[in-house]
């Protein structure tokens, strides 16, 4: 698996986690929903970091 494929898979997994947390949140009590909101925000940050790294990998690949 190439670094680019690894990063793409990681991004996909983060997106799936967001979907899962969003589904759970619909049935959660208030405190748990707040925790799930926090986890969703963390997953979004992870996606940003992974996308930034993916851009770098692609730029280096072009050289």
Curated annotation (Swiss-Prot):
Going by the entry's taxonomy, the superkingdom of the source organism is recorded as Archaea
A GO molecular-function annotation: oxidoreductase activity
The secretion signal range is: none
Q: InterPro entries under this entry? A: Ferritin-like, Ferritin-like_SF, Rr_diiron-bd_dom
Q: What is the name listed in the Swiss-Prot or TrEMBL entry for this protein?
A: Uncharacterized protein AF_2240
């Amino acid at each position: 698996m190439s670094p680019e494929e690894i990063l793409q898979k990681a991004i996909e997994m983060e997106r799936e986690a967001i979907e899962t947390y969003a589904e759970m949140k619909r049935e959660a009590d208030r405190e748990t929903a707040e925790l799930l909101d926090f986890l969703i925000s963390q997953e979004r940050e992870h996606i940003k970091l992974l996308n930034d790294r993916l851009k770098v990998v692609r730029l280096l690949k072009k050289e």
